[in-house]
Amino acid sequence: MEIIKRTGQKEAFRSIKIADAMAAAFKSVGTDTGAVERLTAEIEEELKRLHAAGNEIHIETIQDLVEKTLIKHNYPAEVKSFILYRESRAKKRSARKRITDTFSSLDLDGELKSIQKDFPEEEYSLDALYHKYSAFKKEGVSDADALSDLIRAAVEMTTQEAPRWEYIASRFLMVEFRIKLKAHLERLGIQSFYEKIRYLTQEGLYGSYISEHYSKAEIDSFAETIASCDSGEKNRNFLLTYSSLDLLIRRYLIRTTANVPL
């Protein structure tokens, strides 16, 4: 069974998401979560019935059914908590959308979700960032210029009272750098870490000792290890502030003779 997200995209139904949301609502009011599995199964059966009858299953359909099920089984405090959870999620979506709507093709929603998750405090709200960003963003600018404005907004919001904006600015700077790097690599026809090592060696920008002492399979394995430290919650890039990442990019990356970082 597939469900339809708010974006219109489809994804496989996963009952664990319902269970997690209800468990969070139960825990927030001090209720034991023992009934969650049974309630989730009941909701899943109703969704299957609706789907079999030819109905499309939207995210809102599921959330409405969760509320109805909690009310049916006399969980007033829990349903109130779930409603507040829905409202909170809606506000976060709205805050992200206000920013993403200012870009024509660059998709920042995933990055903004990560920021909301890692910086839940009120002083790091995306609404505040949007107000700062919109104060000097011009209409009709390119996505590249808009991203530069967003980085500038986050940097300018860094204060003694809210110092972690510098980490948020760093994330946007990394997005900008990745876009530029991808374009450079595509122009050079470089599609892998191994090919990058080969190119740098051939151009005299990197010692030949790596390609001489390690096979392609070994270098590919190194690339996987590096990539594992560059994604998810363990992303080491998240340890860098804006100023430290900016310094790293400007001074310590290997560059071509045309001063292009690779």
Positions of the model-derived regions?
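Extended catalytic cores of very large enzyme megasubunits
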Residues: 1-262
